[in-house]
Amino acid sequence: MAEGAASREAPAPLDVAGGEDDPRAGADAASGDAAPEASGGRMRDRRSGVALPGNAGVPADSEAGLLEAARATPRRTSIIKDPSNQKCGGRKKTVSFSSMPSEKKISSAHDCISFMQAGCELKKVRPNSRIYNRFFTLDTDLQALRWEPSKKDLEKAKLDISAIKEIRLGKNTETFRNNGLADQICEDCAFSILHGENYESLDLVANSADVANIWVSGLRYLVSRSKQPLDFMEGNQNTPRFMWLKTVFEAADVDGNGIMLEDTSVELIKQLNPTLKESKIRLKFKEIQKSKEKLTTRVTEEEFCEAFCELCTRPEVYFLLVQISKNKEYLDANDLMLFLEVEQGVTHVTEDMCLDIIRRYELSEDGRQKGFLAIDGFTQYLLSPECDIFDPEQKKVAQDMTQPLSHYYINASHNTYLIEDQFRGPADINGYVRALKMGCRSIELDVSDGPDNEPILCNRNNMAMLLSFRSVLEVINKFAFVASEYPLILCLGNHCSLPQQRVMVQQMKKVFGNKLYTEAPLSSESYLPSPEKLKHMIIVKGKKLPSESDLLEGEVTDEDEEAEMSRRVSGDYNGEQKHIWLCRELSDLVSICKSVQYRDFELSMKTQNYWEICSFSETLASRIANEYPEDFVNYNKKFLSRVYPSAMRIDSSNLNPQDFWNCGCQIVAMNFQTPGPMMDLHTGWFLQNGGCGYVLRPSIMRDEVSYFSANTKGIVPGVSPLLLHIKIISGQNFPKPKGACAKGDVIDPYVCVEIHGIPADCSEQRTKTVQQNSDNPIFDETFEFQVNLPELTMVRFVILDDDYIGDEFIGQYTIPFECLQPGYRHVPLRSFVGDIMEHVTLFVHIAITNRSGGGKAQKRSLSVRMGKKVREYTMLRNIGLKTIDDIFKIAVHPLREAIDMRENMQNAIVSVKELCGLPPIASLKQCLLTLSSRLITSDSTPSVSLVMKDCFPYLEPLGTIPDVQKRMLAAYDLMIQESRVLIEMADTVQEKIVQCQKAGMEFHEELHNLGAKEGLKGRKLNKAIESFAWNITVLKGQGDLLKNAKNEAVENIKQIQLACLSCGLSKGPGSAAEAKGKRSLEAIEEKESSEENGKL
């Protein structure tokens, strides 16, 4: 398995004697990891959580004196006020044989401040690309940040907290962006402190993402509290969380003594957090008591609260909460609304919706009444189905189901009657139950003569268990439409004599009744009926006697896949097909799925009827896919094709369905009884569209005239590539691999992210390994993938054990790209056999951005510039027919205009994001929030005013403003202007492109004749036809991209206006701006509505 993560080295050691002129340059100084990487790509000494300075406990002499001590001791968490007494940085390594955990998690701002006071090593990045190792600390009076060593005077090697304007997480300053070492610096380990009136930056890199988050959270807390008395000195005891835990403890403490039995405390914590193991809770109590030099079976209120906070606080969730809440210990309704809109991509969020979420997930009664969500409620919300990675819209039928049957991928099973391998496994009726419950819409019935004139199903390599044909039909009838109401295809393998064939017909008619679809196909039609029209119908696929013959029986070729396999294995196969006799009654049950033999595409396109279906062995289909990928795609636009596993797969292993989906093959039959990566892809793919078993293929595979090659390794014509940003944050409750031989439950997990799709999209990346942590391993690694054909892409998360013996597989989850939800999401992991594992999840952040315009609208309409300095234009091809080439030449200028407008808008948006210090995945609302924070003066009035000009929101200064603000306003104005040009010009340009497309399509039917007249034939004619399809595809695709870009621009303007109003930028002399802004929103909506109605 290829490793995607780059190898990283250890950070340079701290040089106490070095000054600012003694840089640590190179990759080792820029490393973003917390530990050196050992051979084989494995990380050693990587710990989860963050080690904090220890707190001295008060010893208890005896259990008898515990009650008195509990009443007398003040319940206050101590804070280290003198870091000079603590060991810091470069601690000597020791070997411990104790089973006690030695680390404490960050669970509050108090913990962040404590860590900062103790200090740690950070890398200081200078604008000249030099990097220095420095030891940073927070003053004991919390007024300044200091670093050493430095040649500067001690009073100069510091930064006053009061001078800090902003703290940015990530590489989001000019120093990082322009730094030659930027690519070697971990995004999640970098942060910047902007200070002074000119927003100068102090750019730093921590040794881990955890440490970076601690500094960012702590500094933001200090800055936000700079004008208020600092209350963190009281520790955690006055937080809403502590008050709630105190209430919980007191309710369980029936004696009111302030202590309870350890067993009771363990049970209470398990009730509050069912995911915790009892052994882990008991170990935590022992650790706390050991630190206080006491050993007892009773737990105080303080110990209970401390244990709960350490066990149940996920640092990554705490840092997220602090970031959202602007450094509070909870979220109010406004914070939650902002989180849902900005991070989660939810639209039309109201305060009532947020209060409802708080009421459902907040654990404390006080929080529910006052409308705030503390860390534990927020964690539960993030773990709830509402924050699942899978788009809820795709959990129901969401696609157009009125297109021809050949336009859909169909969930299909091979050897459905088997539950083990096909060579030795017995037949089992549960195979049908399982497949149908999984939404399978094409199943196999391999029928042979049975005793007593009763047809049977069996594995002819294992006759130990026989299934009566009738019993199988009854099971199918019972479960056929439980998971899906759309048509079920029965692939009939007929090996029966004529008398038993007639018994089969009688039984099918009796069991299925009017569900059997036997209507003769209409010769006036060109395509198969739709799934919508065939609801609750059972379609028989099989051989059929010629309709013009009056014979009651006749001879047909036998497509016996199992017999072919047996003959190949035994060496009896000579390439000749067998023939069988077929009765008229069974032939008449076959209507729109008549099995025919494939010859070649040229003959099929001329002679094959739309109701005829070809079956391809895996070997044949693979050869065709490699040699004739474009022809295979075009063939599948009209006809159904079925691909079944190779005859040599006697172990019932599975083929890779993606290889054949890329060619448009609708029915790719899988061995449902064999779990593994290939079955994971199949199962994940058919989760979409409500799991109904039918998935609409990409439009480029359905359009009559379009160009697409399954083997493409570049950009697809007419489709705008997208960038998928995946941050693997953490894992929860990873189990030990099922087949592991090692003793104990310790694992070293890492995560692989796989992208499956067309060859241009296939990719894989992996995280570093987290040592000996299965409960809450922190990965904090971000990956980026370019996706050229999103509609045909799958994302697979795989968790593996790096220190395995026997079995490395921990869990996986596979999801279609189109079903990904943006934002912070939990991935519910599945076992090797595909079952959801309770409480086992992967915490990730998902963002989808445009590469160069277009992309997804609404919740996924983010923007990013990832192109080359020289703009590339999609080129039209020369066909060699002057009349048609002249038409396409007219489209060249409109195409350039369309690409220019889209990319100009995207580039302007990216410029605003960069000046706001935000990453490309940030939303425009985040930009406006950042922008407004800099444009609000010290007396809380804006330095600019929102002014509406022709329904577009401009910002005008209300006096003299600093140069930094001038640059930001100039970038904002350019963004509005480019959006305006796109909105106002898009329809005109798109119409020109559409007219060229229509004019070109008028020659489609006569293309062969025109080519022949011009002397084109053979390969030249085929090339001309291919170029024509390419041009039509480009024109249609670019027209659609421009339309989508206009919709995105309109949505952006609405977001900007609403954000300006909500951020207070409408205040001041332009007091009527708010009302005017609302009117402009209505004007844009009315304009859009009238344009749409005009087109209709």
Swiss-Prot record:
Tissues in which the UniProt entry reports expression: Expressed in brain. Found in the granular cell and Purkinje cell layers in the cerebellum; and in the hippocampal pyramidal cells, dentate granule cells and pyramidal granule cells of the cerebral cortex in the cerebrum.
Keyword Nuclease: no
Cellular localisation: Cytoplasm
Coiled coil spans: 1040-1060
Top-level taxon in the UniProt lineage: Eukaryota
Keywords: Coiled coil, Cytoplasm, Phosphoprotein, Transducer
Modification Phosphoserine, positions: 48, 78, 96, 570, 1080
Compositionally biased region (Basic and acidic residues): 1075-1096
Domain spans labelled PH: 114-224
Residues recorded as bearing Phosphothreonine in the entry: 94, 557
Biased composition regions of type Low complexity, renumbered to the chain: 26-41
Pfam assignment, any one: C2
Recorded GO CC terms: cytoplasm
Principal subcellular localisation of the protein: cytoplasm
Subunit architecture: Interacts with PPP2CA, GABA receptor beta subunits, GABA receptor gamma-2 subunits. Interacts with Ins(1,4,5)P3, Ins(1,4,5,6)P4, GABARAP, and PPP1C. May form a ternary complex with GABA receptor beta subunit and GABARAP. The formation of a ternary complex with GABA receptor beta subunit and GABARAP could be the key step for facilitating the association of GABARAP with the GABA receptor gamma-2 subunit and to allow it to be transported at the right destination.
Protein task: Involved in an inositol phospholipid-based intracellular signaling cascade. Shows no PLC activity to phosphatidylinositol 4,5-bisphosphate and phosphatidylinositol. Component in the phospho-dependent endocytosis process of GABA A receptor. Acts as an inhibitor of PPP1C.
Family: Belongs to the PRIP family.
Descriptive protein name: Inactive phospholipase C-like protein 1
UniProt source species: Rattus norvegicus (Rat)
